[in-house]
Amino acid sequence: MNPQPGEIWLADLGLAAKTRPVVIVSRQDPDPPRALVLYVPLTTQRRDSPYEVPLPRLPFLDRESVANVQGLGSLPTVRLERKIGRLSGGIMQQLKDALAFALDLEQASE
């Protein structure tokens, strides 16, 4: 299993969150010290927050969704069940911008 940034996977997030779609946001590491990925969960609970990236209607999702960067997490790759799709480069850039905002990394490039 080799999840790539921008891919959407169904992931087992445990009892509280169950199985849900997540976007992989960690870089690909050919020799990872741990078999972990960073992810942002997708949700249908839209709050129009700067921590959300609205997604267009995607054929592999049942409903319109948002990527909620406040839910950023990590999990072992063995909890990824199956890949269901991929986000476009433009949406991934919006997701990166939202992550930079959430983590207060906007000043890092100045």
Q: What is the role of each PLM region?
A:
Residues 1-110:
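Conserved functional hotspots at enzyme active or ligand-binding sites that engage polyanionic ligands
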